[in-house]
Each structure stands twice: as C-alpha cells, then as structure tokens.
Amino acid sequence: MKINTVLFDLDGTLINTNELIISSFLHTLHTYYPNQYKREDVLPFIGPSLHDTFSKIDESKVEELITSYRQFNHDHHDELVEEYETVYETVQELKKQGYKVGIVTTKARQTVEMGLKFSKLDEFFDVVVTIDDVEHVKPHPEPLQKALQLLDAKPEEALMVGDNHHDIVGGQNAGTKTAAVSWTLKGRAYLEAYKPDFMLDKMSDLLPILSDMNRS
C-alpha cells in the first residue's frame, strides 16, 4: 500500500519547544513547590497531557497549575522556541508532491497556532488535531483517527512522525506506519525500544523513505 498521508507531532518534532516546555514546568513547580523539582525531574513530563502530568503531582490544583504553566509558556514562547533544520523545506516539498499532511498534538489549539505561526508552518497544514478536539490523547488512536478522517485518508496509507513513545504507539494503535525522530530529548535508544518503522536523523530523511515506499 502506498503512503499518501503524513501526520506529525508538533513539539520536539516540527518545532524545538524543549526549553520552553522545561522552563514552563520549572517556573510553575517552583512557584507552587519551591526547591522540589530539578530539570531532570521534569523531562518525563514531556509528552503526556498537562492534565495527566499535573494530576499526578497535585489533583486538587490541576487547573491552577495548567493556567500558570500556559501563562508562562505563552509569555516566553517566541524567545524560547527554535526551528529544526530541514523541517520547513521537507513539509513544503511534501505539499508540493501532493501528500496530505496533518498535525496530531496533545497541546491546546491556541498554543499550537502560536508555534505554527512562529515557524511559518501554518500555511501547509489544513488539518490540526489538538487536545481540544478529542476525548482521548495519544497513544489512544482517537486523535490520529480524527486527523485521518478529516484528511479522507486510510491508516494503511499514512505515516505518523514523532519524538515520543506516545506518537509511535499511537500510530501503531491507529494502524499507520511510524517514524521516530532521533533528535528527541529522550534519546534515540528510548524510541527504538518502541520499534518504529523508520528512524529519522533529520526531517528531510522522510523524502527518500516515502519515495522508496511508494516505488515498491
């Protein structure tokens, strides 16, 4: 089956929001729980939804913690977000070649739109599925299924690209092919354990992979 659709995670995949996310967590946690969390403590928080993360820390303050996190995140967004090499050119080329492209993220839509505008990727994506659009987040298949439905695409014709196990397992649960990015903050070996179909060292690696898949 040929691939005609590529779904991307956003944070850590299309745009480098690692420092923004870490700083947002540390600011929020230092405000409410001074001197209890270090940088390495918050790395596991990258990937799950804010609600899932904060509910494990203090269920009575979840909404308050989310509000504090998002306020800092929005205020410092443009100074802390960076672009990844070859991402813009690759997505541009995929669109030019006629691929359907979408984003499946656990972020809130307002923050997603800030990131896409900052990176100038907003012109390429017709379908963006955020946490505001679904009942269940990755690795549940619902967000991917929703994106595929909106793109009028079948799972067996799609590839999910991401930097976290939620993306790889989510793709597997939805029946898509999967590609992990080696620039994940959690390390290449971490993602290899989830057996993605492909490992990308830079985003432009996607182009020959898709070309080979669609030639066979």
UniProtKB/Swiss-Prot annotation:
InterPro entries to which the protein is assigned, alphabetical: HAD-like_hydrolase_sf (IPR050155), HAD-like_sf (IPR036412), HAD-SF_hydro_IA (IPR006439), HAD-SF_hydro_IIIA (IPR006549), HAD_2 (IPR041492), HAD_sf (IPR023214), PGP-like_dom2 (IPR023198), Pyrophosphatase_Ppax (IPR023733)
Keyword Hydrolase: yes
Cofactor: Mg(2+)
Active site: 9
GO cellular component, one term: cytosol
Enzyme Commission designation: 3.6.1.1
Pfam families in UniProt: HAD_2
One function term, GO molecular function aspect: inorganic diphosphate phosphatase activity
Catalytic activity line of the entry: diphosphate + H2O = 2 phosphate + H(+)
Transmembrane segment boundaries: none
UniProt entry keywords in alphabetical sequence: Hydrolase, Magnesium
BP GO annotations: DNA repair
Keyword Metal-binding among record annotations: no
CDD domains: HAD_PPase (cd02616)
HAMAP family per UniProt: Pyrophosphat_PpaX
Family, per entry: Belongs to the HAD-like hydrolase superfamily. PpaX family.
Function: Hydrolyzes pyrophosphate formed during P-Ser-HPr dephosphorylation by HPrK/P. Might play a role in controlling the intracellular pyrophosphate pool.
UniProt protein name: Pyrophosphatase PpaX
Biological source species: Bacillus cereus (strain ATCC 10987 / NRS 248)
Gene symbol of the encoding locus: ppaX
